[in-house]
């Protein structure tokens, strides 16, 4: 079986693959030690996508997620995928100056802050006068003002051309630079372990690296 031709077209499809056979299996254990089944996670992602759409997020929009590792960040990431929006994942511990540079560079439609689990994210949200929005399943998230002038990118059916995530590096100059990662590239890395039998369905992986870093993601 060819790995590439059988990859999910979008990264949220990885959850659907994981749910096959037994959707009650644990997908994630969150920052509070609560287990999330694939079914519960998929449902939360679907609802978050509806709520993000209500907040004006369109296919092709850049969605900036200022976060630390948490179930809220994971759900917002996969919800962005469902909407064909680009998730720009930013470590909340970055400086105010860096966040301002990144926001000016990527021109997100909105910025989402996981303030409930990160005092740094909350500080950035307060500085931007973000509003609290309730999200079914993950609780409250602070959301920045809508940028009505933000222009959506073209959406590609081809997963190798459609951007899933933008990661900002520190860069050799100290100025953050965006790296665009396609759905296919992320799905390939995620599914390769299954293909090579190096990762099995009953394995547990501890995510120590921030998901705003390519390795943690």
Regions found by a protein language model. Name each.
Residues 3-27:
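A short N-terminal helical cap/helix-turn-helix that marks the beginning
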Residues 7, 24-57, 61-70, 74-78, ...:
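Conserved AMP-binding/adenylate-forming core of the ANL superfamily
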Residues 8-9, 23-24, 147-168, 175, ...:
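Conserved pre-ATP/AMP-binding loop-to-beta segment of ANL
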Residues 35-39, 164-188:
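Conserved AMP-binding A3 loop
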Residues 42-47, 179-200, 205-209, 215:
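Conserved structural elements of the adenylate-forming
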Residues 78-83, 105, 213:
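Short hydrophobic alpha-helices that are characteristic scaffold elements of the AMP-binding
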């Amino acid at each position: 079986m060819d790995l590439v031709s059988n990859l999910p077209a979008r990264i949220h499809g990885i959850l659907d693959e994981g749910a096959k056979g037994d959707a009650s299996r644990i997908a994630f254990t969150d920052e509070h030690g609560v287990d999330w089944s694939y079914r519960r996670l998929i449902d939360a992602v679907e609802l978050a996508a509806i709520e993000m759409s209500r907040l004006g997020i369109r296919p092709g929009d850049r969605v900036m997620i200022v976060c630390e590792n948490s179930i809220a960040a994971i759900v917002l990431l996969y919800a962005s995928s469902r909407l064909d929006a680009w998730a720009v994942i930013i470590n909340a511990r970055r400086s105010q100056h860096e966040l301002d540079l990144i926001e000016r560079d990527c021109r997100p439609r909105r910025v989402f802050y996981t303030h409930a689990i990160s005092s740094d994210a909350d500080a950035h949200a307060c500085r931007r006068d973000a509003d609290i929005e309730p999200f079914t399943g993950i609780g409250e998230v602070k959301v920045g003002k809508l940028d009505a002038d933000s222009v959506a990118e073209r959406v590609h059916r081809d997963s190798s051309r459609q951007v899933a995530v933008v990661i900002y590096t520190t860069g050799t100059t100290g100025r953050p630079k965006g790296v665009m990662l396609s759905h296919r590239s992320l799905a390939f890395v995620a599914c390769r372990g299954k293909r090579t039998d190096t990762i099995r369905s009953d394995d547990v992986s501890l995510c120590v690296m921030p998901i705003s870093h390519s390795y943690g993601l």
